[in-house]
């Protein structure tokens, strides 16, 4: 043991009935993956992969499928919609948020997520966690983050850091970059329609100034923009990524496609009744349920428009499989949806040269699921093996879960 992580033999081979490599290619049957340290050095049929003597060999049951680690493209480390009145918990002390982030990250890892994009956190909890992972103090996914996300005081965003002016937002962006932010984020619109309209809390001039400030710092910029004029103003300003886009219209879809703008789909908050029931506001609970049909319709259009899309769980901890299932329900093939949640997600994070697919030279971020996701994509909920950087984490996570259960008795 080194820290909390089990270090495998220098070379490890995994044999599987099938491998879905994340590129969209036809799955390999009766296949093997060879890992040296934390790097994949070969992948192919068992006959084509030469396994050196002394290699540790993991042979998966015939009913399991080997895949790349999944990528959660929109996550808030300390947020969990499955906690009662969770919106009040975001105001807890930062030390408590950090502890909650540990639990959330462990659940996400166990669901097969090995890379995460964080879209607003308080107290630099995300950066502290990333440092703790790098130092071997905790186990966790690969993290790319905007650190704090900003909103105008008059605006929406319960995890947003409030600012009173564009100048204050510029200073906040600069502080984020100095602290270690990989990209930047601000909040523009609300989340649900109000009287059939989507409120926007920033003017076109303010949005343009914010986008320019981020780009001047050499960072891409993501925006919480759900629909309406606010989303169009973001596209006019040249944002790099739209988060959520629940009510994106046909014109916006065409503009996003033309500009190569990303859309990160986070369908769960409109469709997960368990999560919705934990909201304190009856009005918000009703709005989320009432607006489901329109969200399904608009996101289905976007998914089928050949946009650059990724998926995220937002605060629905451990539910990445639900987002992949939503893509399939909207018309994607299972193979395409898996690519979105692996290689495509890695492209969004800017790590596709090292993660997102099972290819030679990439990091050994590997999971297995019980079943064949090409026949039934919902089996992605049944994650067995979890490996990040060639280190097997599922056994540790299961042991920690057992200890937690014993402690609670």
Protein language model regions, located:
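Active-site gating loops and adjacent loop-to-helix segments of metal-dependent hydrolytic enzymes
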Residues: 76-97, 106-109, 135, 139, ...
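N-terminal metal-binding scaffold of metallo-dependent hydrolase/deaminase domains
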Residues: 1-52, 65-66, 371-377, 391
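C-terminal cap of metal-dependent C-N hydrolases
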Residues: 341-343, 347, 360-406
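Histidine/acidic-residue-rich catalytic or RNA/ligand-binding cores of hydrolases
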Residues: 81-84, 126, 195, 231-237, ...
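His/Asp/Glu-enriched, well-ordered alpha-helical/loop segment
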Residues: 216, 286, 290-373
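Histidine/acidic residue-rich metal-binding segments in metalloenzymes
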Residues: 128, 167-263, 277, 286-309, ...
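Alpha-helical scaffold segments that flank or form the walls of functional sites
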Residues: 86-139, 163-182
